[in-house]
Structures are given as C-alpha cells and as structure tokens.
C-alpha cells in the first residue's frame, strides 16, 4: 500500500512546483519507513514517460530539425543539454550527501519554504519577451543551475526552473515547455542510475503505472496554473507544508 501511495505522490508532485522528492520523503517519514531512494528514482522513470508523451510534438520537432541540420533546432538542443549539465554534476559529485538529506525532515521543511517563496514571487514575473528558441546560452545555463538545486528534497525542480525562466523574461507557455523538456534527461538519468536498487515487487510496478497516470494529470494542471498566473497557490501550500514538517515531523 505504501508503494501505491508513493506512486500517486510522485506522479502528482513531480510537475507541480511543490517538490516530489520532498513529499516522498515526508510520506516516508509519516509511514515511519526508511527512505528508499532506489524506488524514488524508479518512479522518476514513470514521470519521464509522462512528460515525454506530454511534449512529444516538441521532441519530434527538435529531432526532425536536427536531422535536417536546422541551425535553430540544433541551437535549442544544445541549450537543453547545457541546462542539464549542472544537475548531472551535482548528482554525481554529491550523491551520498543528497541521499542523507532525505532523512532530515528539518532540512526538507526549510527547503519547502524556499520553494514556496519562489512560487509567490513567480506570479509577479510577467515580462513575456523570450521564446525557447530565442533565449541565449547564458539563460539556459542559469536555468540549469537553478535545476541543480532541485536535487535537494523540498526544492522543486519544476518550481525552480519555472521561476528562473520567468525571471529571465521567458513567455509563460515557453517557460513551461522548456522546464518540461529539460527535465527529460535528468529524470531519465536519475531513474537509470538507481535502477539496480529496485526490487521490482508487484506493488512497486503498480506504483510505477499509478505514478505515470497521475504524472500526466499533474502536467496538464501545472501548465494551466502557470499560464493563468496562479503559481502563488502552490507557494502558499509549500509554506504551510513547511510549517507542518518543521512542527510535527
């Protein structure tokens, strides 16, 4: 039953800017269980499939553009690769430390409050100047650096990347697309690296499919909320969740 609940939690919170890793760690603490980082990573593969389906048209355009040697799409692909490098470096170099943070509900509570503040600020950012094709390489790197911090439970990957993209002047819909596209190699890599630690029980496999389905729901919801300027709702939620974690866990 725990695996199924964690599958729902992962699917819904992976793309909502409220930190899936933080919520997985919180629910693990509520269940009084040892954090299973391997299973958490396995669930990332489920949400990887969900986002791949959600942005399939954009992925096809990029692949097709690269095959035709279209400079515009080659540059976009290069920027996406650049955006993933900081998270890869942090994940490989500080993996043991990151795993230890999953057991610290205090740090998770603090990081959730940071995510909440970023979301409250995001709704005030509305420059709407740049598209995913027009952002400079420096912007791509900055968004990638923000993503690197999201390896910490409580820091939302979608939240930090959306905040960074909007702060740098990207259009809302393009910020959502870029955030989802740059999540593909990170979530896939996280899942593959820890795959050998997964027991592949019936409950875990079912949790995988539940995470996939709820991930699709989360994707549609966050796109609607970002475009509608309602990220502050997630901000208030994260602040309240932070208070709960710090006071009761």
From Swiss-Prot:
Tell me what reaction this enzyme catalyses. di-trans,octa-cis-undecaprenyl diphosphate + H2O = di-trans,octa-cis-undecaprenyl phosphate + phosphate + H(+)
Q: Where are the transmembrane segments?
A: 11-31, 35-55, 80-100, 101-121, 135-155, 180-200, 202-222, 226-246
**Into which family does the record put it?**
Belongs to the UppP family.
Q: Which UniProt keywords apply?
A: Cell membrane, Hydrolase, Membrane, Transmembrane, Transmembrane helix
**Which GO CC terms are listed, alphabetically?**
plasma membrane
- HAMAP family reported for this sequence: Undec_diphosphatase
Q: Where in the cell is it found?
A: Cell membrane
Q: What does this protein do?
A: Catalyzes the dephosphorylation of undecaprenyl diphosphate (UPP).
**Enzymatic class:** hydrolase
Query: Which gene name does the record give?
Result: uppP
Just give the chief location class. Answer: membrane
UniProt-recorded name of the protein: Undecaprenyl-diphosphatase
- Disulphide bridges, residue numbers: none
Q: So what EC number does this one have?
A: 3.6.1.27
The record's PANTHER family line, in alphabetical order, gives: UNDECAPRENYL-DIPHOSPHATASE
How is the protein disposed in the membrane?
Answer: Multi-pass membrane protein
Q: Which GO terms describe its molecular function?
A: undecaprenyl-diphosphatase activity
